[in-house]
């Protein structure tokens, strides 16, 4: 009897302990869930504030950083872009670009990146402003600045130009492109000239370069490029053209220098000074005009065929070697 009562007492205590343990486990679980929920809610609240920019933590280095930024902006504050693709440069960067691109263009005139950088870095504001005034004082120049056409293979429709008569400006132009194996799409956009309209004027000059080749018949070999640079410099006044005409011949052979100095330099000076401003020619609107009438109207003489002169020179050289 006593044993039975003892067993019942032990069973009652076990059940009580089990109930207490279950209650304790439930309370712990509920407490953990409540605390976790509070933490998650606080994290979500902070995240929302952070996303909305409503959090303002005090930075111990804020005063120092602000002073440092002010000092840096005083000397190295790069201005904002004035047009798509514009890359503002500090004065010292422009000077470094002039030095580096000048050396690169002299040693490797075939590399376009040096020519492009030298052209833009030396296209100083007074020169471009003078061209701007020249365009604004001419009805066609004003139309170009107002409409801002771009010269590409699409805008010109080269296939249509190939169907024009042989004596037209358009057919002469596309024949020159085909013969030299070049395309108007290779002209890179201007990005280092700060003023937006002056940048377009330089872009226009750059894209018209092949027209100067085509109306004169000069090829893209080094002698032909120098001859066109002389014409450009005397007529338009772009500094890089003058630099190219001055220094590029230094690396040429005596026979090449002789042709330039005796034939193409005098031609470039005369045609460049006597002809009307080439920057004011709206090429896209005169593609069907007669090329000879255009040369006469502009005052541009067609120089001797450079390729024929070179061909004759090498033929004579071969004859002398045989003798």
From Swiss-Prot:
InterPro entries referenced in this protein's UniProt entry, alphabetically: Coq4, Coq4_euk
Pathway listed: Cofactor biosynthesis; ubiquinone biosynthesis
Catalytic activity entry: a 4-hydroxy-3-methoxy-5-(all-trans-polyprenyl)benzoate + H(+) = a 2-methoxy-6-(all-trans-polyprenyl)phenol + CO2
Keywords per UniProt: Lyase, Membrane, Metal-binding, Mitochondrion, Mitochondrion inner membrane, Ubiquinone biosynthesis, Zinc
EC assignment: 4.1.1.130
Cofactor(s) recorded in Swiss-Prot or TrEMBL: Zn(2+)
UniProt-annotated location(s): Mitochondrion inner membrane
Pfam families documented for this protein: Coq4
Membrane topology per record: Peripheral membrane protein
Enzyme's top EC category: lyase
GO cellular component entries: extrinsic component of mitochondrial inner membrane
Keyword Membrane found: yes
GO terms classed as biological process: ubiquinone biosynthetic process
Keyword Zinc included in the entry's annotation: yes
Subunit architecture: Component of a multi-subunit COQ enzyme complex, composed of at least COQ3, COQ4, COQ5, COQ6, COQ7 and COQ9.
Protein task: Lyase that catalyzes the C1-decarboxylation of 4-hydroxy-3-methoxy-5-(all-trans-polyprenyl)benzoic acid into 2-methoxy-6-(all-trans-polyprenyl)phenol during ubiquinone biosynthesis.
Miscellaneous information on this protein: This protein may be expected to contain an N-terminal transit peptide but none has been predicted.
PANTHER family: UBIQUINONE BIOSYNTHESIS PROTEIN, UBIQUINONE BIOSYNTHESIS PROTEIN COQ4 HOMOLOG, MITOCHONDRIAL
Family statement drawn from the similarity comment of this UniProt entry: Belongs to the COQ4 family.
HAMAP family: Coq4
Protein name per its UniProtKB record: Ubiquinone biosynthesis protein COQ4, mitochondrial
Organism: Debaryomyces hansenii (strain ATCC 36239 / CBS 767 / BCRC 21394 / JCM 1990 / NBRC 0083 / IGC 2968)
Gene assigned in the entry: COQ4
């Amino acid at each position: 009897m006593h044993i039975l009562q003892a067993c019942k007492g032990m069973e009652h205590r076990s059940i009580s302990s089990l109930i207490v343990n279950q209650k304790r486990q439930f309370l712990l679980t509920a407490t953990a869930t409540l605390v976790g929920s509070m933490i998650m809610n606080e994290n979500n609240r902070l995240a929302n504030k952070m996303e909305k920019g409503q959090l303002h933590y005090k930075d111990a280095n804020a005063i120092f950083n602000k002073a440092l930024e002010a000092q840096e902006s005083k000397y190295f504050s790069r201005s904002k872009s004035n047009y798509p693709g514009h890359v503002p440069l500090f004065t010292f960067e422009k000077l470094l670009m002039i030095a580096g691109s000048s050396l690169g263009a002299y040693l490797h005139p075939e590399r376009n990146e040096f020519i492009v950088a030298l052209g833009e870095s030396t296209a100083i504001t007074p020169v471009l402003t003078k061209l701007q005034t020249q365009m604004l004082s001419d009805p066609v120049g004003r139309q170009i600045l107002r409409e801002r056409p771009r010269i590409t293979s699409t805008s010109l429709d080269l296939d249509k130009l190939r169907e024009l008569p042989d004596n037209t400006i358009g057919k002469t132009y596309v024949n020159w492109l085909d013969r030299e194996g070049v395309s108007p799409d290779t002209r890179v956009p201007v990005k280092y000239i700060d003023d937006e309209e002056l940048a377009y004027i330089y872009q226009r000059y750059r894209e018209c370069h092949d027209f100067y080749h085509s109306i004169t018949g000069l090829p893209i070999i080094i002698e032909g490029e120098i001859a066109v640079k002389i014409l450009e410099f005397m007529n338009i006044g772009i500094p890089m053209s003058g630099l190219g005409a001055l220094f590029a011949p230094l690396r040429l052979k005596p026979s090449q220098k002789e042709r330039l100095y005796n034939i193409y330099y005098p031609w470039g000076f005369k045609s460049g000074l006597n002809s009307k401003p080439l920057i004011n020619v709206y090429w896209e609107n005169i593609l069907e005009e007669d090329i000879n009438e255009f040369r006469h109207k502009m005052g541009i003489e067609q120089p001797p065929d450079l390729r024929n002169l070179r061909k004759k020179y090498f033929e004579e050289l071969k004859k002398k070697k045989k003798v």
